[in-house]
Amino acid sequence: MNERSLRILEFNKIKEKIKKYARTNAAKAKVEDLEPYDNLYEINNKLEETNEALEILISKGNPPLEGLADIHEGIERAKKGGTLSPGQLLKVGGMLKATRNMKEFFKREEVEKSYPKLEDLAYILAPVKALEDEIERAIVSEDEISDKASQTLCNIRRSLKEKNSSVREKISSIVRSNSKYLQDDLYTMRGDRYVLPVKSEYKSQVPGLVHDQSSTGATFFIEPMSLVNLNNEIRELFLKEKAEIERILSDLSLKVKINGDSCLSNLKVLVEFDFIFAKGRYASALNAIKPIVREDGAFSIFSGRHPLIENDKVVPSDIYLGEEFQTLMITGPNTGGKTVTIKTVGLLHIMGLSGLLIPARDNSSIAFFKEIFADIGDEQSIEQSLSTFSSHMTNIVNIMKHVDDKSLALFDELGAGTDPAEGAALAVSILETLRNRGAKLIATTHYSELKAYALKTDGVENASVEFDIETLRPTYRLLIGVPGKSNAFEISKRLGLVEGVIKRAKEYMSEENLQFENLIRELQEKSIIAKKEAREAKMLRDQAEDLKKKYEEKLEKLENTREKAYMDARREAKEIIANAKDEADDILKAMRELEKLGIAGGGRQRLEEERKKLKDSLEEREKGIHKMKENEGESITNVTLGMEAYLPSLNQKVIIVSMPDNRGEVQVEAGIMKVNVKLKDLRKTQVTKEEKVRRKREVKLNLSNVESRVDLRGLDAEEACYKADKYLDDAYMANLGEVTIVHGKGTGVLRKAINDMLKRHPHVKSYRLGAYGEGGDGVTMVELKG
């Protein structure tokens, strides 16, 4: 597709809007590179992907892409043997978490709707759970490693806490005993060592090592000799901690290196998902639909809206071309919306051919054009004025060099900017040349000569943008089949021009011209009504055919389901009878064995009686098996819509969807079929003991699976508060005493939002920022009520 048309039709503005819905820079770059695809298969494939994304957003909500970030730098560093920073490891962990969550997101039950395009993409994802868990366990934030990263690190930090506590106790004692020599009754730190702020005149009174001096020279910072060994031990522990952290980071970096290719493959798929769902979110914002893409060069856009005009201001239009006519001539006054109309056609085609859904009504179609050419103004926005004749003509000459039968050409004010007679003649000649090449054309003009050309030329149709004479404003509604009028006399009259001047002006126009205008208007208005009714009739007929086909399919499924249910019931009955007959045969066989062993004649007669009685019983059982099923269970007396019941005749559970009628019948839903049955034939459903136990077990399992921390990094404030609120409810129900909310340090906006939420939360007893080793300012520790 030529760059000039993409620019003139403002496709770049569409891409800027889509970028706002993408999470990653990589997905935004894909949006920036978006342009019409050059083959029909790829167009339909991309449209289906975007449509599936829209349906998922409506039915399941946003996909779990939180925490997704670019990890290329970290992976490259790991592959070269380098050690990744905690921040780089966090990004890898976030990507792996998004991988696993997306994989889970696309798992579905058989009864759920399938999304084959996106499910195939999700199938490629390969979670690395072990590495994800290790990173999550080890890394708290971009500048802190968790105590849980290793037992060695945990022991070192425990020792550090103990040593620091001992030093603080000792130095507090020294402060008290030497307070008269100190500037303040406080100790401070220089480097990693505890020191006292000693007045310069008393520095000899406090034996120790001088570490620093104030800028005025009035204070010396002295480490008391009694603390030197303790400070040395603390220093050694800090060095051990640093070495252990380096080892942990190095070990994790090596594992990232081993899984580097898998990580990059997952990232590529996740970025593609980010790109697709950005298009889906934009489609949702536009209330857009998936268009049909036609190969024959024809299109029908119903209630098409320009996507860059605000919803409350845009006027939908029906625009069609390619079946009854190949060229559309839109006439009427300036500022009437003609330019908006042709820009809408061009932009909606570019969007659809780029795999984007379009703001229009269902069943709208676009054509598969190889090229779309546009001569609209001086590459200006919709609101700006037209360019000069020479600028127009330079562009038109270039267009005419490249147009063929796979092209759509859009001309705004064709032939304008020069003598009207010459301009109209040029316009007709240009249109005829391009029509002979088989191109589809839409042109706007206010020349009467072009209205007449459209009226008498096969394959060319007039159209206009409606104008309200009362308000002197265009309605922007496109009327295909109705030529536009300049409305100069009517507008002048409404603006106060005296009647005599208007009457004299009409006299200067030939009677033929006046009659011509009125006759055209009258004929075309009748024509538009007839064509509109014909199109609506065709649409209704097509819809009726679709409905008929759908209901025939449903009826077939219903019959198949009913037949299957009947066959299942018969098979079950036959199995019961067969088992009973086998049991009877075993009994009779045993009787014969006893008879052989010498049972008396009277006994034999009794055996025969029992045998006959058993046979009669089996026959009765076979006849009445259906009756037995019906008599099982408790009858239903009180009916509520949506209640579950058991239908013995189908041997399955059903849902009651109507109240009893005067015949005592209710409608029930059994799978995909609905049937009317007598209320007396239904039975209450019984929840088995096993089901009750299973349900209780599921509740207990759900509560026992609540973790003691929740990670909100990567979410915005609203999403984070929602997730934290739900997590606190679950944690409270699971009787967790204290939990950790991880929000990261960042700008502090997320932390403040969480704190505001915690102040009002009914389950929260108290909360505080994390201490050293817990996550510091990057986490909030929450104590829950008992």
UniProtKB/Swiss-Prot annotation:
ATP binds at G332, P333, N334, T335, G336, G337, K338, T339. Its EC number is 3.1.-.-, 3.6.4.-. Endonuclease that is involved in the suppression of homologous recombination and thus may have a key role in the control of bacterial genetic diversity. Belongs to the DNA mismatch repair MutS family. MutS2 subfamily. Residues 710-785 form the Smr domain. The lineage of its organism: Bacteria, Bacillati, Bacillota, Clostridia, Eubacteriales. This is Endonuclease MutS2. Disulfide bonds: none annotated. The keyword DNA damage does not apply.
